[in-house]
Amino acid sequence: MWYSNTEDVKAEYADVFYLVSTRIFHEENADGSILYVASNTPEQKAVLSKEMAFVSNNLFPDSLNFFSPFYHQLTLEAAELGSETYNRMSSDVTAEVYESFRYYMDNLNGGRPVVLAGFSQGAFLVKKLLKMMPPEDYSRVVASYSLGCGVNDDDVSTGRIIPAQGADDTGVCITFNSVSDTSAVWPLAMDKCSHCINPVNWTVGAESAEFSYDGQDLTVRLDTSANVLVVDGYKESAPGFNVPWPEGCLHRYEILFYNDYLKSNVLRRVNNFRKSL
């Protein structure tokens, strides 16, 4: 089953294939035992649809076709089991997402360029897809946006994940993670990060950039040692929910902070890619 932004596909431009973040916190059997994979009940799909609708409306230009599969995601409780266990448990989820991508490319894409994007668990799966897809599909990827999941040297060594160096390059991976301090790095999403880009000024250097969110004037800079974004000045206006990441980790804000910058950048890269066809 799919979430899409239009019944009338715009055949002449480009698509977005988006993988939603971890939205299901807890799942259990009838006997009360914990399940670590969501069942995709109607109620759960309604929760996933909220993020899909938000990113379709706020993160991507209206001129792009938007497709997002309802995959059986790992729950947030699975993230508390540690990186090794989480990676092992993700194999079935990865296989399902690849099958969805294969169906999309064979039946829905129509030969158009595609922007591959995901947030959090979705970003983790974006990296998996890039490594798995055949060359003919890879050649049609405008860029990939792995938001809230770091890229490390092992990823880059595959030759399929090429870190973005600016605002205009295509065939690259845009990746970043935000914290208030480098002590707040969340190992599951940010461990061994070797690449990062600042989505406000689109540089891979340490130059600071100013932006606003929730009525607050903020500054963001890339810490080139930890390869994460350090956001100065943000004060949460509402309490957060119970999460397994360190205090000061701004993981939940990756899309909220930067959606305007990302939206214009997606269109910029699509236009550049189409010029090269």
Region annotations inferred by a language model:
Residues E12, L19-G111, A238-L277:
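Active-site catalytic motif of lipid deacylating hydrolases and related acyltransferases
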Residues E27-E28, E77-A78, F124-K127, D153-S157:
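Extracytoplasmic/secreted cell-surface and envelope-processing proteins
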Residues L116-V126:
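Gly/Ala-rich beta-loop-alpha elbow adjacent to hydrolase catalytic centers
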Residues D15-L19, N65-F70, V115-L116, A143-S146, ...:
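Structural recognition of the beta-strand scaffold that forms the well-ordered cores
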